[in-house]
Amino acid sequence: MMRAKAYAAGTVLNALPTGIGSAFGIEMHTIVKLRPSDELKVFVNGVERRSIVAERILNSMDVTAEVIVESEIPGGSGLGSSSAFVNALICAVKKMKGEELNAFEILRSNARFSLEAGISYTGAFDDASASMLGGFVVSDNRKMRLIRTDEFEGYSAVLIPKFSRGKVDWRRLRERASEVEGAVEAAMRGEYCKAMKLNTEYICKMLGYPLEIAEKGWEKGICCGISGNGPSYVAFGSKNEMEALAETWGEYGRVYVRRVADEPAEDVVIPTPFFRKLDG
């Protein structure tokens, strides 16, 4: 049985408004195991489900298998669960076929499959990159290129709130994209805490999430904010900071404290053309 894994992704900058996104890898895992079979079946945490994206991936790669998914990343939470699943599945298939794990090819395929299957508005190249590579990334999702990457040794707090995701009006988010330009500029400079704060103020205002959850962290000088299109909130910093924030956030839902992923989830090859020139 072949297996591969990928990380959760916490958001610094939502890519929906401008096409530029930023995220970081979190040590919450999705593991995909492949068992050769005459029939495609997908089991997610023990429950059989149909997966259009899995069908597209396996058919395009000429593989038939039973797909067993073990994931601790909640779906529809803003933590890149779909990106992690697609990353792990593509890597597992490539391993099964004895192919090189070229990060650029895998992540471009991830974005393409995600768009075709309708599980992402932007292709989520930022989430996919953080999910595979770990650390912090800034990406141009439209050109499917990385702008910068940064390592970080520390921890993350992840809040899964009691409330669910609201409606995402992506057109409205893009129409007022100028309001988030400061966050884009900060992310490109590697000022992730500032970018996260500006992004959170915008996304919470536009999608109706409570800003007070992030403000509880900001009051303590902690870098935190809304993740993806919500409803989860994430933070990064020292272990002590994350444990203190977990106590504060506990009233809003379940909180996990995990390491920020500091190495790729799989033994991937990272080619130079992966990066976009800032003037490109």
UniProtKB/Swiss-Prot annotation:
Record-listed ATP binding positions: P74, G75, G76, S77, G78, L79, G80, S81, S82, S83, A84
Principal place of residence: cytoplasm
UniProt catalytic activity: shikimate + ATP = 3-phosphoshikimate + ADP + H(+)
Compartments reported by the entry: Cytoplasm
CC terms in the record's Gene Ontology section: cytoplasm
Single Gene Ontology MF annotation: shikimate kinase activity
Pfam hit, one: GHMP_kinases_N
Enzyme class: transferase
Keywords: Amino-acid biosynthesis, Aromatic amino acid biosynthesis, ATP-binding, Cytoplasm, Kinase, Nucleotide-binding, Transferase
GO biological process: amino acid biosynthetic process; aromatic amino acid family biosynthetic process; chorismate biosynthetic process
InterPro entries on file: GHMP_kinase_N_dom, GHMP_knse_ATP-bd_CS, Ribosomal_Su5_D2-typ_SF, Ribsml_uS5_D2-typ_fold_subgr, SK_arc
Involved pathway(s): Metabolic intermediate biosynthesis; chorismate biosynthesis; chorismate from D-erythrose 4-phosphate and phosphoenolpyruvate: step 5/7
Secretion signal, residue range per the UniProt entry: none
HAMAP family: Shik_kinase_arch
PANTHER family: HOMOSERINE/4-DIPHOSPHOCYTIDYL-2-C-METHYL-D-ERYTHRITOL KINASE, SHIKIMATE KINASE
Protein name in the entry: Shikimate kinase
